[in-house]
């Protein structure tokens, strides 16, 4: 396939099909940056060319095996593939995720396949998307059904093109801490007082970044 093989997802759950598309997208980005470092800092053209060769193979594999046709949403990215025609349609809250592809630098947020994928994964077609009385968003197979992850909410805001969507998510994040004043790993979409991990620094950091990008970046 040209892609890198994964045994486990960012959530630490085992892969079903072992070519994890978001991880390969992230690897492609890093290989491009590594090539730039090799040229500019190390003056090692051979190393740069090898990094770009591997990057090209990964991207070709993603395009060949990681994009599938959905009857409702059109061309979308699969979460996992095996290179033999099998694939898993889902997205997990943990990063790298399909939702995070523009944040990682793999593609622009207006990319049509990404927009199709985003519409799909932010719907109940995604088995890890949960809608409750208080919140809706992407969760994870790592936690119970119905639990939304603040990491995914923050990433939804960071990759949104709409200021109103960013503001709505910030209000949701700040309003679902159950009085802890910190982001949790996950919380129950019907009742945020039911949560996992009272303090999850990864989610804290992404929430802070979303607030900075939305309100402060242009003024500092």
What is the predicted function of each stretch?
Residues 1-28, 40-41, 48-149:
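Extended ligand-binding clefts on enzyme/binding-domain cores
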Residues 28, 32-35, 55, 208, ...:
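Heptad-repeat amphipathic alpha-helical coiled-coil interaction surface used
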Residues 31, 118, 169-173:
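Inward-facing hydrophobic residues that define packing positions of alpha-helical scaffold repeats
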Residues 35, 39-42, 162, 215:
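Short coil/turn linking the two alpha-helices of tandem helical-hairpin repeats
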Residues 35, 59-63, 174-175:
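Structural signal for well-ordered, non-membrane alpha-helices
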Residues 39-43, 67, 188, 219:
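Short, flexible helix-adjacent loops and helix caps
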Residues 88-108, 146-220:
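C-terminal capping/lid segments that line or modulate ligand- or cofactor-binding pockets
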């Amino acid at each position: 396939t040209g892609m890198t093989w994964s045994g486990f997802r960012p959530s630490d759950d085992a892969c079903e099909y072992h070519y994890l598309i978001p991880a390969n997208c992230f690897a492609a980005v890093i290989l491009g940056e590594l090539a730039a470092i090799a040229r500019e800092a190390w003056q090692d053209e051979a190393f740069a060319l090898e990094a770009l060769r591997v990057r090209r193979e990964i991207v070709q594999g993603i395009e060949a095996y990681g994009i599938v046709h959905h009857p409702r949403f059109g061309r979308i990215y699969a979460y996992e593939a095996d290179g033999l025609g099998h694939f898993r349609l889902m997205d997990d809250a943990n990063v790298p995720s399909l939702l995070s592809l523009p944040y990682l630098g793999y593609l622009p947020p207006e990319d049509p396949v990404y927009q199709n994928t985003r519409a799909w994964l932010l719907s109940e077609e995604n088995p890890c998307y949960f809608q409750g009385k208080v919140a809706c968003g992407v969760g994870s197979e790592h936690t119970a059904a119905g639990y939304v992850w603040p990491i995914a909410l923050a990433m939804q805001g960071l990759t949104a093109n709409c200021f109103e969507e960013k503001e709505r998510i910030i209000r949701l994040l700040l309003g679902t801490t159950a009085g802890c004043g910190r982001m949790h790993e996950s919380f129950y979409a019907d009742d945020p007082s039911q949560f996992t991990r009272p303090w999850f620094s990864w989610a804290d950091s992404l929430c802070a970044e979303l607030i900075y990008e939305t309100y402060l970046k242009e003024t500092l």
